[in-house]
Amino acid sequence: MNIAIVCYSTFGGSGVVATELGVALAQKGYQIHFITYGQPVRLSAFHKNIHLHQVYVEEYPLFRYQPYELALSSKMVEVVREYNIDIIHAHYAIPHAYTAFMAKEILRKEGLEVKIIT
């Protein structure tokens, strides 16, 4: 099974829990794809079943804060298409759960179905 885990990559609790969950699932043989803006701090060792997909946000001078949500949902769509993801685990409601929903709707229009859990 191919699982995408979308999380914050910082020291905070949700990022730690999501990373530890991903590592445990990878050790059981699942293919884990972390989608985040940086390497999770608790992801310190290489594992053949763990893949990191970094979200890059382009600088655009019109915006005070760059549109991370759009870049994140686009990266989710890309990863689901390329790696045949079965489940997106969106480990935080805002912005991860609603960007996962946006990605799911884009993929549905292409005939691809992916489950989301939060």
Segments and roles (model prediction):
Residues 1, 30, 50, 114-115:
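A structural micro-motif
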Residues 3, 87, 102-118:
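Active-site proximal beta-strand in glycosyltransferases
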Residues 7-11, 23-68:
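N-terminal strand-loop element at the rim of the active site
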Residues 13-21:
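Conserved alpha-helical elements of sugar-nucleotide-dependent glycosyltransferases
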Residues 15, 41, 96-98:
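Short, well-ordered alpha-helical microsegments
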Residues 62-87, 97-102:
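An amphipathic, basic-hydrophobic alpha-helix
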Residues 93:
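Active-site beta-loop-alpha junctions enriched in small/polar residues
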